[in-house]
Amino acid sequence: MGVQRISIEGTKVKMEVTIELSRSMLTSEENIKQSLNETGCMVTEAALKYLDTDGSAIESAGAVMRTKGEQPKAYQTPYGEVVVHRHVYQRSGGGKTYCPLEREARIIMTSTPLFAKQVSSKLAYGSAREVQRDLAENHSPLVAVSYIQRLCEAVASIIETKEESWNYVPPKMDVEIHSVAIGLDGTCMLLCDNGWREAMVGTLAPL
C-alpha cells in the first residue's frame, strides 16, 4: 500500500493511491480506510498551504508585520493529525504573533472546520469519552477528552456570537397552538467534587 502526491497545479491536487486487497473483506476495508485517511491528510496539508501567504510583509491595524519564517504546527483533521509549516508574523517591536493561514482556514483551536463540526455534532448525542472512542475506532484521529471538550466550548462560543447577527424566518406551524403548558421539577444529581445537589428542570409543551 502507498499514497503519493503526484502534482499540485493551481487549485488541483493529483494523488496516486495503491491499496492491497485481501481475501478478508474486513482487512480490505481497513486497508481502504487507512489509505483514504493518508490521502486525506496529504490533501488537507496541501489545502492549508494553499491558504498561506508567500512570506511577504503584511499590514495589520496600521502596522507592518513581517514573517518569522515557516514554523511547524500540528492541526487536527477528520483524517488524522497534519503538521504544516506555515508563516507566522510579528511586528518589529515584538508582541503578539499572527498566522494568516489560521484565519483564512477558519481554524478553531488547532482543528479544521470539518473536524470541529464532526466533533461538536457527535458530542451533542454523547459524552466526550464516547466521542473519543468513536473517532479512534471509526475514523482516525486520536485526541484527548479534554481537547474534545474545549473544542466544543470554542464552537459553542462562536455560534453564540454569530447568532446575534443571524436572521431566519420562523417555520410555519402545521397546527395553531392555542396554549402552552409550563412545568418545573427538581431532581438530585451526583457531582464529582460537591456530592449530591438539587437540579431544577423546566419544560414547555404546546397544547
Ranges and model annotations:
Residues 31-39, 107-111, 123, 140:
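Catalytic cores of large soluble enzymes that bind and process phosphate-bearing ligands
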Residues 1-58:
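N-terminal alpha-helical interaction blocks
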Residues 50-78:
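Glycine-rich, N-terminal phosphate-binding loop and its surrounding beta-alpha-beta segment
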Residues 29, 41-44, 128, 145, ...:
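Alpha-helix initiation and N-capping motif
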Residues 123-136, 198:
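Short, charged amphipathic recognition helices of the HTH superfamily
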Residues 1-22, 66-74, 81-114, 118, ...:
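RNase H-like nuclease fold core
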